[in-house]
Amino acid sequence: MRILKSLAELRRWRQQQSEVALVPTMGNLHDGHLQLVKTALERCDNVVVSIFVNPMQFGANEDLDSYPRTLEADCQALDALGVSAVFTPQVNDVYPRGLDKQTRIEVPGISDILCGASRPGHFTGVATIVCKLFNMVQPQLAVFGEKDYQQLQVIRLMVQDLSLPVEVLGTATQRETSGLAMSSRNGYLSTEQKHQAAELYKTLEETKAKLSVNTDFGELEAAAKEKLTQAGFVPDYFSIRNAADLQEATPEDHEWVILAAAFMGKTRLIDNLRVTNAAAK
């Protein structure tokens, strides 16, 4: 496995390859990330995993400085899976003119709702780094997790709007035995908080079951927020949306997605669950 620390190294390596799949990450890899890599390896012999904690997608009071960085352990895990290369650029290689002067990618209509409303500029940072990685690595395939469902849809729209020659593949959320979605930020939780945090997924499941008989979305959302509050969360949002474009749900939608973000202590957790509308024609 090659460890490519600069754009120049990456480009020299890339010239020697044919098809390549990319798995973009910020490191501190867990089993959810490794499942993305396994999915990519099923589709492509040459898999590149990028590890870059992207400062553009962090807000002023977020956890950029404290975000866990475990590069050595990450590389060992990726080498064991048979990854071809790991791309670990420095900030000045990715943003040579600095963040303030960097050209940015905006995906309108989807970037300023839900997580985008709570984290202004976040999805601009995500879209910009992913677009740059696509240009740097030039993959035919890129694999992302569905846990970050809004992020996945932002990237899909960006690829569509900019006519990028990349297939974007979403893979199912990997979960702990409790149902808690795997996340690097779970490491911030105490043992007790992890136990409490499992209520987030349980609330999503309960809401999914209720949707089969009740499409009063506002009522369901309010009940879910109350349940999360009683479980020790501070809810950010709990929203039922059209799964395709993340606009407000209607009873006629063929598929919904229930999205939630809530704080457990100081840790912000997100999760989602897709629901097929059996009544849709």
Curated annotation (Swiss-Prot):
Amino acids binding ATP: 26-33, 145-148, 182-185
Active site as annotated: H33 (proton donor)
Matching Pfam families: Pantoate_ligase
Record's catalysed reaction(s): (R)-pantoate + beta-alanine + ATP = (R)-pantothenate + AMP + diphosphate + H(+)
EC code: 6.3.2.1
GO molecular function, one term: pantoate-beta-alanine ligase activity
Tagged with keyword Heme: no
Binding site for beta-alanine: Q57
GO cellular component: cytosol
Enzyme class of the recorded protein, top EC level: ligase
UniProt main location, coarse: cytoplasm
Residues that hold (R)-pantoate according to the record: Q57, Q151
GO BP term, pick one: pantothenate biosynthetic process
Keywords associated with the record: ATP-binding, Cytoplasm, Ligase, Nucleotide-binding, Pantothenate biosynthesis
Family named by the database record: Belongs to the pantothenate synthetase family.
Known role: Catalyzes the condensation of pantoate with beta-alanine in an ATP-dependent reaction via a pantoyl-adenylate intermediate.
Subunit structure: Homodimer.
Additional record remark: The reaction proceeds by a bi uni uni bi ping pong mechanism.
Protein known as: Pantothenate synthetase
Organism of derivation: Idiomarina loihiensis (strain ATCC BAA-735 / DSM 15497 / L2-TR)
